[in-house]
Amino acid sequence: MSNSGIQIKEVKRKLIQGLSKRTQDVIVRRFGIGKKKKETLESIGHTYGITRERVRQIQNEGLKHLKTEENLSTIKPLFDDLELFISERGGLVREDVLLEDFIEYIDPEANKIKLRGFSLLLLRLNKNVRRAKENAKFYTLWYTQKKALDQARSLVSEVIKIFKKSKAPFQEEYIIAKLKKLFPFFSRQAIGSYIDSSRAIDHNIFGDLGLSEWPEINPRGVKDKAYLVVKKLGKPLHFRAIADEINKANFSKHIAKPQTVHNELIKDKRFVLVGRGLYALIEWGYERGTVKEVLANIFKKNKGKALSEEKLVELLLKKRFP
């Protein structure tokens, strides 16, 4: 939390009231101040019967007025907080994370939704922070030092290597601890912020971290969601229980139906039916086929040598669910 004790709503009021009514309206609507989202130049122009370019001119005139020495002195404590917030996170923060968390950092009691737009305005007015537009590899970012961009690229490259080698997601704390050894001068907050900046890395619904393209991270259908919940629970489940777990996880508003789950999993090579309606993962060592077929495979792998009844049952239970 900030130590400035400044009242962000009071600063917002003082800044905006110095503008003409139309300029106030343009700034408020363009930045979404007090609203859930910002408006386009076109929609604002339609209100006043003016062109998009004229709206842009009014916006720029308003921003120029807000950058006067008197106004900047009013918001300097907020600028200091903003720069400290970014600095504590390695000098770089993803835009949507910054807009979500900065207001709470200043004032935990403030309405984050209504003040998101004001945070965006502060970013535009502060000459000490820069914006990096989103691209194929990174989200839109705000940074205080250019070296932070290079540090983020270096760390993200290492994270991607770790995941490509492991071919499996990890809990974020494990990854951060591993990266702390590779980058000892980066704080844990900086490492987390750099990871968040990458489009190639994401969290799944259970908080595991992995490559965005993996179905375990961003499941795209019932089959992927089923795979994720069964793997997370670590045991074979009936298709009705799998449907229940998918719905409890709240992946989306769409309800998973038991019969749909059954129909999808019976065709999916990652799953094997190991009992009446029970599905397990092939990667756990279970085998497809009837009990007779599984027994035949066991004898084949043991080159036909005699096995005691106890050993046979033990090997069978590793391949089939009782």
Language-model segments: what does each one mean?
Residues 1-322:
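C-terminal non-catalytic scaffold/interaction domains in large multidomain proteins
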